[in-house]
């Protein structure tokens, strides 16, 4: 029994090697797993289900072996692809999963998150996130033409890349430990799995006088990054 967790593929036409790696992963490994969880930032940008490009089509095609095998795939929104909707998820064979979600993973309650809400020290990002996750903002954005939406996405991505390259922001772009502990206490769990930070690791710490674990998923820029449980 194995369940697979991935995140932060950032699929984009400029990185065809990542979709090729993902295609092999689905055909060679995911079809034999109990389930696949994708915890956000599957795509570099997503401006609506009515506007996906060749990469979106390639992803749907890459997922075909998983659909044919009848294996479940669960998808959680990231900060880059939070507008991915039911229509595309259905075509790809994915079930949308709220952020956060608690699952029973082989007898262990496990909290799943994308991870961006844990980066509470990055106040500028959290303010932006609150704005773009509002239902009214999304309604207005999706009502705009594709070119206008694409221009906004490009601008937001460029700004995010500048923010990431600024070394003075390195600390605030990681999770806040207090936010981690608050989320885990609220969920009544001792294991958390998330992505977003691109800092793959397994962190062990004390939570209410008992051991707890935070598993961080990596990105796929250089190679595939997969967490296999158990």
Which residues make up each language-model segment?
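Active-site-proximal loop/helix segment associated with metal-binding centers of metalloenzymes
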Residues: 115-175
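Short, low-complexity, intrinsically disordered N-terminal peptides in bacterial proteins
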Residues: 1-2, 230
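Core catalytic region of metal-dependent phosphoesterases/phosphodiesterases
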Residues: 2, 11-105
């Amino acid at each position: 029994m194995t369940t697979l967790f991935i995140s932060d593929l950032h699929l984009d036409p400029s990185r065809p090697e990542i979709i090729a790696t993902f295609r092999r992963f689905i055909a060679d490994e995911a079809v034999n797993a109990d389930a696949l969880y994708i915890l956000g930032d599957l795509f570099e940008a997503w401006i609506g289900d009515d506007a996906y490009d060749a990469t979106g089509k390639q992803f749907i095609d890459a997922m075909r072996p998983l659909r044919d095998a009848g294996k479940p795939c669960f998808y959680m929104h990231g900060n880059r692809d939070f507008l991915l909707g039911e229509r595309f998820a259905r075509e790809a064979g994915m079930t949308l999963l709220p952020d956060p979600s608690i699952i029973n993973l082989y007898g262990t309650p496990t909290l799943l998150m994308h991870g961006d809400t844990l980066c509470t020290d990055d106040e500028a990002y959290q303010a932006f996130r609150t704005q773009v996750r509002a239902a009214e903002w999304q309604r207005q954005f999706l009502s705009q033409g594709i070119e206008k939406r694409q221009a906004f996405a490009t601008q937001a991505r460029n700004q995010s890349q500048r923010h990431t390259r600024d070394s003075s922001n390195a600390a605030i772009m990681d999770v806040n430990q207090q936010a981690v502990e608050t989320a885990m206490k609220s969920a009544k769990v001792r294991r958390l799995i998330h992505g977003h930070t691109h800092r793959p690791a397994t962190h062990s710490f004390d939570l209410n006088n008992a051991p707890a674990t935070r598993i961080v998923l990596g990105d796929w820029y250089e190679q595939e990054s997969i967490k296999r449980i158990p």
